[in-house]
A protein has these predicted regions:
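N-terminal export/assembly segments and adjacent metallocofactor-ligating motifs
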Residues: 1-241, 255, 278, 389, ...
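Phosphate/diphosphate-binding loops
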Residues: 13, 403-404, 409-413, 417-420, ...
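N-terminal leader/propeptide and maturation segments of large enzyme subunits in energy/redox metabolism
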Residues: 73-84, 241-279, 458-540, 588, ...
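Glycine-rich phosphate/diphosphate-binding loops that line cofactor/substrate pockets in enzymes
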Residues: 91-110, 163-172, 262, 283-296, ...
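Extended redox/cofactor-interaction regions of prokaryotic respiratory oxidoreductases
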Residues: 125-194, 198-205, 212, 228-232, ...
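Short beta-alpha connecting loops at secondary-structure transitions
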Residues: 214-222, 435, 450-462, 607
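Active-site phosphate/pyrophosphate-binding segments
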Residues: 234, 253-370
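Long, contiguous, secondary-structure-rich segments that constitute the structural scaffold
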Residues: 468-514, 599, 604-617, 621-703
Length: 703
């Protein structure tokens, strides 16, 4: 009879692309095997709660289809022919191909391409050290945060806000533009605590009746891309009804009189016509926050993934400034704490030898880059070699057809370092197997909360699997730059140096003992009661959209992006979205699925079985007009391509709006083309970004 394995408990942090960065307790069954993963109860933001997909992480780390050996392509790209190759030979091949590309076209012909498949600062960002040391093309990270961060920053002047734990002390929690039940479960933990202990109301604003909307006391379902109009109506009502805090406005904001005059025509009736909301619902929401000083606005990314997304974020975060909610514990607003952590990544990233004259390529425009668009290439050489880590561009990037066409080029060498045979890995010349987060050392910071969290190595990886850090280091040695600063150090060395530089004198060992560091600023700083982070200390209702610093401003060589002339002077609804027309009558949003995180977890049985299959939600009125019923196979399309999938008829969505949840593998769709076939890569004003939820399509029935 087999004895059960002894269980010990290890401590880590969730590495995935989620603002929560949950602190974790992990069952360790032996040196290579894990059991259940739980949220750390001792961490007062995680509060013992994590999402179901991470709780089932044993299913992923021990998956039968996990990549375990380096593979070299045999036959044509994408045909699926592979042969095993040793690690030394594989890395020799990468170095050889990089040097060939450099000899033919110069160093900029090599493009290391990465993103947030891990949020660990060492394993994610160390690729830049190799990039800068070798003068390879830079990457402008536009795919996720640009619209949201730009919109917040132009108002507040810093990326911080009210302590996210204060949601539990609020009397009204407004969850705007994020399906927190699916994507940020800890938001619901603290909002539910406020409801239980204080009788707080939960307001949810989104474009369809998702799981978070179903938990709301007041649910406002508006048309995609119209959040700014709702925000303006709320502020109009505040000035109209005397619930605007004029004393706060005079002390803390730049031009309240100009804003009030601007909003005179932004009535609830005006907003109702734009948003599709009832005037009564807008008035009720305004009355609630007008009488509730402790109103906490938790602002997500989803509503900013429109072509007017930066404008929408600025308009929405202006609301608590007009009402004066910032003055009260449990009030104000929060989007990201990315400014508070004080971690200097320069050694990890090798920024000391970054050359600003080297071109920077827009990651969201990878399709245009790889298919030779001169503007996307900054009028420079073609990209001839790539190392891709922590992302799956053939699946997650906009304008999927040119992305895949570019990756399939015979004259492009692509090495993909991955955990599974993703859509991108399937188009590579060389695939290297990567460790998972419990198999290496790293450090994390939670933009959606307030902690630096250590993720130490807890189990041994399979013998033939290697870390990102190993790949950077080995390529640096083969490419002749291993003597540069930052190379030759272990992950723990880099963590120790960075933590000590931030003032935590015990470094790695101290963090390992304590598990996390709480970096939340004092109340007055978090609530901007000492002034907003501009020289005059004023919140800016009149932002400088293009003239100042931004958290992710494009390099000067790229300049402002998108139709900047359409950006408004004051908070407003900007008509910059992809508007429906007679040829494309439906607005399509590609919303997150509960069981997936971008394209991660789409390979695990538990997540796949709970999600079912790719489906398209349509309102019954639209289905009846099109002569369609549930289960029909439909095609949706625009000038970027077409996608076939099954139909779900539901009042969850508004008439004229289609919703597809989750980034399924391309191969899960009937024609092998994923939902981002339909997503545009045109840059969003003012500093770029991908408008994933801002697409117009036609719809046709018939298989």
């Amino acid at each position: 009879m087999n004895k059960p394995l002894p269980v010990t408990m290890g401590h880590s942090a969730c590495p995935h692309d989620c603002p929560s960065t949950c602190a974790l307790d992990v069952e360790l069954l032996d040196g290579r095997t894990i059991g259940r993963v739980r949220g750390a109860a001792a961490n007062d933001y995680t509060a013992g709660v994590i999402c179901a997909k991470v709780a089932r992480y044993a299913e992923r780390i021990h998956h039968k289809d996990r990549l375990l050996k380096p593979l070299q392509r045999v036959g044509a790209k994408g045909e699926g022919g592979w042969r095993e190759i040793g690690w030394d030979d594989a890395l020799d091949l990468v170095a050889e191909e990089f040097l060939k590309a450099e000899a033919r076209h110069g160093s900029e012909a090599v493009w290391p391409y990465q993103y947030a498949g891990t949020m660990g600062l060492v394993q994610r960002d160390g690729i830049h050290r190799l990039r800068h040391a070798k003068r390879y093309s830079g990457q402008f990270d536009t795919i996720c945060t640009n619209m949201a961060w730009t919109g917040w920053f132009v108002g507040a002047g810093a990326m911080r806000g009210a302590d996210p734990r204060e949601m539990a002390k609020s009397d009204c929690v407004i969850i705007w533009g994020t399906n927190a039940v699916a994507t940020q479960v800890n938001v619901m933990t603290h909002a539910a605590k406020a409801r239980k202990e204080r009788g707080a109301k939960i307001v949810v604003i989104d474009i369809y009746d998702n799981a978070t909307m179903k938990q709301a006391d007041l649910a406002l379902k508006l048309r995609p891309g119209t959040d700014g109009a709702l925000a303006c109506a709320l502020m109009h009502i505040a000035f109209r009804d005397g619930t605007a805090d004029r004393g706060y406005l005079a002390r803390y904001t730049d031009d309240p009189a100009g804003l009030e005059a601007h909003l005179a025509t932004r009535t609830p009736q005006w907003a109702a016509a734009i948003t599709g909301l009832d005037v009564e619902a807008i008035e009720a929401f305004a009355a609630l926050i007008g009488r509730t000083q402790r109103s906490y606005f938790r602002l997500g990314y989803g509503f900013t993934r429109q072509r007017n997304g930066a404008v929408a974020m600025h308009a929405v975060m202006s609301v608590p400034a007009v009402y004066g909610h910032w003055q009260h514990e449990g009030g104000g607003a929060f989007h990201s704490n990315s400014d508070i952590f004080g971690l200097d990544k320069s050694e990890i990233m090798g920024t000391a030898y970054r050359d600003p004259s080297i071109r920077t390529l827009d990651q969201s425009r990878i399709g245009a880059v790889l298919t030779g668009d001169a503007e996307a290439l900054c009028d420079g050489p073609p990209v001839a070699a790539m190392l891709i880590q922590n992302t799956n561009p053939a699946n997650v990037c906009p304008e999927q057809r040119p992305v895949r066409r570019g990756l399939a080029r015979d004259d492009l060498f692509t090495c993909v370092h991955e955990q599974f045979m993703t859509d991108t890995a399937g188009l590579a010349d060389l695939v290297l197997p990567a460790t998972m987060f419990l198999e290496h050392d790293d450090i994390y910071r939670g933009g959606g909360q307030n902690h630096i969290v250590l993720g130490p190595k807890l189990v041994e990886p399979p013998e033939t699997v290697r870390t990102n850090h190993f790949v950077f280091e080995e390529l640096a040695r083969r490419l002749g730059v291993a003597d540069r600063p930052g190379f030759g150090l272990t992950e723990r060395d880099l963590i120790d140096n960075m933590v000590k530089k931030a003032g935590h004198t015990e470094g790695y060992e101290g963090l390992k003992r304590d598990r996390w560091i709480d970096c939340q600023p004092p109340f007055e700083e978090a609530h901007f009661l000492n002034g907003f982070a501009w020289p005059d200390g004023k919140f800016r209702f009149k932002p400088d959209w293009t003239g100042g610093y931004a958290p992710n401003r494009p390099p000067d060589s790229l300049g402002p992006q998108g139709p900047v002339a359409g950006l408004p002077v004051f908070p407003d609804h900007a008509e910059l979205i992809e508007a429906a027309d007679a040829s494309h009558p439906y607005r399509l949003a590609t919303s997150p699925a509960r069981q997936f995180l971008n394209s991660t977890f789409a390979e695990t049985t538990g997540s796949r079985s709970r999600e079912g299959a790719p489906e398209l939600m349509i309102h019954p009125e639209d289905a009846a007009r099109e002569g369609l019923v549930a289960g029909d196979i439909v095609t949706i399309g625009n000038e970027r391509g077409e996608v076939r999938l099954s139909l779900t008829v539901t009042e969850t969505v508004k008439p004229g709006v289609l919703v597809h949840e989750g980034i399924w593998a391309n191969t899960d769709f009937l024609d092998g083309e994923g939902i981002n076939t339909l997503t545009g890569a045109d840059p969003v004003a003012p500093f770029g970004g991908a408008a994933f939820h801002d697409n117009c399509v036609w719809l046709r029935g018939g298989a």
